[in-house]
């Protein structure tokens, strides 16, 4: 009788130990899978972030190269508008371009606004206001349709959405970051922009 009782106790302990080991093993597997998935998700997001930064930098460098060859492109005008708006105060300003083959076309006077009002300066005043819509003046010697072609800044159009202004802001900010990280950025920033 005593032997039977001891065998029962041993079997019960053995059963509970087996259950405990199985549960512990399952928990370990779950934790390993969870940490592996978490690690791969973190790596994936880090790779996506660096890839996005890389393509933004490449796009900014390509934009600089394209603007050096064809400075009258709309995106170039858009980014330069942001850079002039950043230091603008709502008045007409005179910008002097450097002479040379790679310089931008001679520019005249144009409307500037602070950074926070770029979308309004681009798209005109919001509905319900009586403020006059700012008009872009010609940035080429030939006027809007002169010998040098169309001007860099066309008249403001209400069809331009806020997304266009946001694109200009983000794109120009990326260009500014690229210029600030490159050697000799101070001189080139004034020459190219």
UniProtKB/Swiss-Prot annotation:
Domain of life where this protein originates: Viruses
Compartment(s) of residence: Host membrane
Membrane topology classification: Multi-pass membrane protein
GO CC, one annotated term: host cell membrane
TM segment ranges: 15-35, 36-56, 160-180
Keyword field: Host membrane, Membrane, Transmembrane, Transmembrane helix
Full protein name: Protein B4
């Amino acid at each position: 009788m005593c032997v039977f009782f001891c065998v029962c106790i041993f079997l019960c302990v053995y059963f509970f130990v087996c259950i405990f080991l199985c549960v512990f093993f399952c928990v370990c597997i779950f934790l390993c899978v969870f940490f592996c998935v978490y690690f791969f998700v973190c790596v994936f997001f880090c790779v996506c972030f660096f890839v996005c930064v890389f393509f933004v930098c490449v796009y900014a460098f390509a934009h600089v190269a394209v603007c050096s060859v064809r400075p009258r492109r709309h995106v170039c005008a858009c980014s330069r508008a942001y850079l002039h708006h950043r230091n603008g105060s709502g008045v007409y300003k005179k910008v002097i371009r450097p002479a040379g083959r790679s310089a931008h076309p001679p520019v005249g006077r144009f409307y500037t606004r602070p950074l926070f009002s770029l979308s309004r300066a681009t798209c005109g005043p919001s509905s319900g206001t009586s403020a006059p819509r700012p008009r872009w003046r010609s940035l080429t010697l030939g006027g809007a349709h002169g010998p040098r072609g169309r001007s860099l800044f066309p008249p403001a159009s209400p069809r331009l959405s806020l997304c266009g202004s946001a694109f200009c802001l983000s794109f120009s900010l990326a260009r500014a970051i690229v210029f600030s990280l490159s050697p000799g950025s101070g001189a080139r920033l004034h020459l190219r922009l």
